[in-house]
């Protein structure tokens, strides 16, 4: 038995040294709709693949729609495997990364002999599919990757005995300032579609003099179409109270477009009183938008707003920084696991002698 254990440990150590260990990433099937949380996972997986690691995308069913229509064909070149109807190969040196929404999957794989990591992008989902009293550490998930310091602070209070690391999302170079004057278009991006409908109807009812203003709902568009559509506008509206990072307003700022947004429950560290028009009551949206339009038409917007937006964008990680953070974190994880395996191997070899 000891010889068998020694052989398994030696194989696991060699796999990690040669980057053969599998890194599984579970993703949601968005049925062709663009979703920032899924894009983030694919970006991490592709970065690892491009740096020699063996990253694999896991999806629930064999008829997975894929992401080529909105994210790009290069992301579908990653290896994909369905959970349903297949026996996954899992070795002790492998890692599996599961979004916080999949508590039921964590429960199912709790006994798998591999490293288990939670990827948490929305604090509002962490208890949604867990049983009462369950925690990540109960299920063998002792590490978590999240997107911001604010979310990390919240999670540390909710999930004990778990270590947390941050990989900050980056804003794609698709989002750049337009060289053309903006059109009379308002970008609107809300988590709940009913908020979009309510704001538009309320605005037109209360301010019929602005019927010539066009609202553009950007939800679900592929990234390039999203960016092309966004750059034509003169202001963006944003509602996502459960947001832990705020990708949309940052994309808007990078394009030089002011944001009127509802302050989320976890206020992101980049948000300040100067880089946007932030409100705490969504019933105020129409009035605030009307005032903004009037100031815009009169060329009376505060120039400090645009300076603060640019200053905020300068603090954001680039794609290169994001990729370095990803590679450094997973290299560190494998190094720690390899050290633990070497310690176990030394013990078994001592017993064998």
Where are these regions (language model features)?
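Extended catalytic core of nucleotide-activated donor transferases of GT-like folds
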Residues: 6, 10-13, 56, 64-140
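A short, glycine/small-residue-rich beta-strand->loop->alpha-helix junction that serves as a flexible
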Residues: 28-40
């Amino acid at each position: 038995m000891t010889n068998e254990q020694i052989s398994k440990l030696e194989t696991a150590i060699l796999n990690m040294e040669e980057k053969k260990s599998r890194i599984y990433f579970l993703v949601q099937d968005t049925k062709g709709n663009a979703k920032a949380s899924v894009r983030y996972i694919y970006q991490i997986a592709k970065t690892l693949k491009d740096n020699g690691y063996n990253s694999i995308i896991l999806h629930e069913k064999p008829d997975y729609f894929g992401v080529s229509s909105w994210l790009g064909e290069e992301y579908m070149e990653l290896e994909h495997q369905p959970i349903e109807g297949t026996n996954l190969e899992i070795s002790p040196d492998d890692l599996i990364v599961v979004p916080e929404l999949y508590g039921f999957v964590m429960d199912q794989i709790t006994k798998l002999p591999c490293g288990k990591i939670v990827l948490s992008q929305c604090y509002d989902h962490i208890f949604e599919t867990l049983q009462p009293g369950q925690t990540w550490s109960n299920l063998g998930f002792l590490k978590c990757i999240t997107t911001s310091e604010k979310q990390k602070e919240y999670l540390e209070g909710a999930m004990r005995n778990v270590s947390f690391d941050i990989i900050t999302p980056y804003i794609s170079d698709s989002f750049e300032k337009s060289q053309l004057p903006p059109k009379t278009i308002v970008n609107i991006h809300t988590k709940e579609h009913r908020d979009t409908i309510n704001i538009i109807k309320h605005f037109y009812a209360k301010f019929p003099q602005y019927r010539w203003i066009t609202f553009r709902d950007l939800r679900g568009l592929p990234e390039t179409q999203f960016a092309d559509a966004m750059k034509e506008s003169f202001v963006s509206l944003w509602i996502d109270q459960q947001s832990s990072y705020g990708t949309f307003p940052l994309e808007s700022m990078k394009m030089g477009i002011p944001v009127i947004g509802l302050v989320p429950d976890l206020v992101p560290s980049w948000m300040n009183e100067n880089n946007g028009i932030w409100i705490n009551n969504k019933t105020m949206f129409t009035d605030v938008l009307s005032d903004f339009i009037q100031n815009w038409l009169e060329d009376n917007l505060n120039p400090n707003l645009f300076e603060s937006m640019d200053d905020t964008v300068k603090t954001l990680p680039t794609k290169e920084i994001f990729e370095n953070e990803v590679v450094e974190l997973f290299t560190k994880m494998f190094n720690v696991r390899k050290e633990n395996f070497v310690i176990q191997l030394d013990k078994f070899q001592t017993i064998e002698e």
